Amino acid sequence: MSKTPLTVAGANKLKAELQKLKSEDRPRVIAAIAEAREHGDLKENAEYHAAREQQGFIEGRIKEIEAKLSNAQIIDVTTLNAGGKVVFGATVDLSDEETGKEVTYQIVGDDEADIKEGKISVNSPIARALIGKEEGDVVTVKAPGGDKDYEIVAVKYI
């Protein structure tokens, strides 16, 4: 199985969530289950069933994060030297050929993608069109809404 690329920031975010789940959320739910058990009959105890359900979600998320981290190839973007080419982790300034509007995207792993923060998945149509290109190149992005042309204004590794 191939490793999944992940930036250092993305890995740190997952590690922080994992730490919170293990040190805060898990003990809180265990205490809630113990308290609900003291209320007697478990068959008709809604608090108990809700706490057990929440425990299942927390344990599932812990396993999911641990699996992601164990299968991750953590890439420090600041140490990249790709010679100006667009690669995973690069921050790319683009100019829309039609409107002249400029946008900035960082190419990140699937789990880190957040368009509001300007982070796009390495598997997105825009990122796939950009990978391997350089400053000054014009790329055509094939998107569901039609083709769009962008000029690569700058490539940074920050």
From Swiss-Prot:
The record's annotation in SUPFAM superfamilies points to: FKBP-like (SSF54534), GreA transcript cleavage protein, N-terminal domain (SSF46557)
Statement: the UniProt record of this protein carries the keyword NADP:
no
Q: Which UniProt keywords apply?
A: Coiled coil, DNA-binding, Transcription, Transcription regulation
Gene Ontology BP annotations: DNA-templated transcription elongation; regulation of DNA-templated transcription elongation
Q: Which Pfam families match?
A: GreA_GreB, GreA_GreB_N
Please, which domain of life does this record's source organism belong to? Bacteria
Gene Ontology terms for molecular function: DNA binding; RNA polymerase binding
Query: Coiled-coil regions in this chain?
Result: 53-73
Instruction: Say what the protein does.
Output: Necessary for efficient RNA polymerase transcription elongation past template-encoded arresting sites. The arresting sites in DNA have the property of trapping a certain fraction of elongating RNA polymerases that pass through, resulting in locked ternary complexes. Cleavage of the nascent transcript by cleavage factors such as GreA or GreB allows the resumption of elongation from the new 3'terminus. GreA releases sequences of 2 to 3 nucleotides.
The UniProt entry, under NCBIfam families, shows: greA, PRK00226.1-2, PRK00226.1-4, PRK00226.1-5
Which family is this protein grouped under? Answer: Belongs to the GreA/GreB family.
Which HAMAP family does the record match to this protein? GreA_GreB
What protein name does the entry list? Transcription elongation factor GreA
Organism source for this protein?
Thioalkalivibrio sulfidiphilus (strain HL-EbGR7)
Q: What is the lineage of its organism?
A: Bacteria, Pseudomonadati, Pseudomonadota, Gammaproteobacteria, Chromatiales
